[in-house]
UniProtKB/Swiss-Prot annotation:
This is Defensin, isoforms B and C. GO terms for cellular component: extracellular space. It is found in: Secreted. The keyword DNA-binding does not apply. It comes from Zophobas atratus (Giant mealworm beetle).
Length: 43
């Protein structure tokens, strides 16, 4: 699951990290973030 797929901004706020976090929560993880290579990293 890469962050560039859902990477867009609203009012200067990037939502790709939010999508990544939601993806990780759906997998039962504690959230996640997008790294410098636009890859979703779950906690």
């Amino acid at each position: 699951f890469t962050c560039d797929v859902l990477g867009f901004e609203i009012a200067g706020t990037k939502l790709n990290s939010a999508a990544c976090g939601a993806h990780c929560l759906a997998l039962g993880r504690r959230g996640g973030y997008c790294n410098s290579k636009s890859v979703c990293v779950c906690r």
